[in-house]
Amino acid sequence: MTRGERACPLAVLLALVTSCATHAPTAPLLTGSPGASTQPPPTATAPPSASVVADGWRIHHLLVDLHTHVEATPEHLAQAVGTFDAVGIGVAVNLSGGIVTHEGDRPSAFERNKSLADRLSPGRFVEYMNLDYAGWDAPDFAERAVAQIDEGARLGAAGFKEFKRLGLYLRDQTGHLLKIDDPKLDPMWHRLGELGMPVSIHVADPKAFWGPYDRSNERWTELKDHPSWWFGDPTKYPPREDLLAALERVVARHPETTFVCVHFGNNAEDLDWVDAQLDKHPNMQVDIAARVPEIGRHDPGRVRALFMKHGDRILFGTDFQVYDRMTLGSGGSGPPPTDADAVEFFQKHWRFFETKDRGFAHMTPIQGDWTISAIDLPADVLAKVYFENARRLLGKRFPGRPASP
């Protein structure tokens, strides 16, 4: 595939996909003339479905997964790219690019990861940087955080990922949890905006993770395998609502910075909340990673309306992970998924977005025992969600694919 194919505008792609279906031979205008057809004039052919159009995008590997975690080893990169090739993902954003601080003379984790991915899989991965919180209690940490961002930009980081460490895991020297909206981080958020580096930010977790830690919890299968994901002890963790409120304060304080609030705004259970936040904050976007099982439980008409309204600010992502084992959105102690399972995982995303199917099994069974219903998005909205929004978000940092030999 050439650079030109990847830069091809949507209109041209639609034409490529639809040409065979819509270009029928033209019948002579005057019947009875030499060579005139004796058959009735052909009827107009219906345009292809959005799913057929999307198949064309997948053939050309145009889709962008904005939310992946892939360990930079030759084996793991190859496994990830094999899956992406099979399902039509051209570019994946690795949110675990690593920190940019050095250990002695050794290159930083970010440099090592980016260098290997660029060498072994050129044009396939975009690397986000992560923050090193060492020295949080030092008086100059705010300046050091900004310096890390500047270094990440110099090294080619396309964006910044903040995990759910803030508010739930990281603590200062006195034992208090670091707050999402701590003023010490404001210079960093501001600098990211100045540099045009988008922020993918994860705060809180599913509402059920604040519920009882027993079989009555609808996410028990997941929680029992991940006890550190349970935050229902109020003596250790803040209410989920407090974390979401802190996130909103950060987004509001930094209108010049683009925040991609992952996992459908970190609150897929509440569509009205997500809708209201997108209305209120033009600098907020959301990805759908690991939350289609939750989104798909809602009334499909309501979900579709939200995607139609905010289609310019919703991004495709999956939380596909490759470390010592592959993870498809979430995982547990069961057998590791196979490459065939990974293909099916992506195909269920296509089914959710591109069909009208009702009551089918979702792609991440460990996340809950329920079914989901599809939302049948039109091709123009699918294009935005699948790749156009990501290209716009990343701008000049979006990779060109190397020319074909």
Feature map (PLM): residue ranges:
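Active-site gating/metal-coordination segments in enzymes
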Residues: 50, 54, 107-231, 282-285, ...
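Acidic-and-aromatic substrate-binding clefts and catalytic sites of carbohydrate-active enzymes
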Residues: 68-77, 98-110, 134-143, 170, ...
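Bacterial signal peptide processing site
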Residues: 21-23
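Bacterial N-terminal signal peptides that target proteins for export
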Residues: 1-10
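An N-terminally biased module of ancient metal coordination in phosphate/nucleic-acid-related enzymes
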Residues: 27-123
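H/E-rich (His + Asp/Glu) clusters that bind or coordinate divalent metals
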Residues: 74, 231, 235, 241-249, ...
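C-terminal motif of bacterial Sec signal peptides marking the signal peptidase cleavage site
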Residues: 17-19
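Hydrophobic faces of well-ordered beta-strands that scaffold small-molecule active sites
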Residues: 64-68, 91-94, 125-129, 160-162, ...
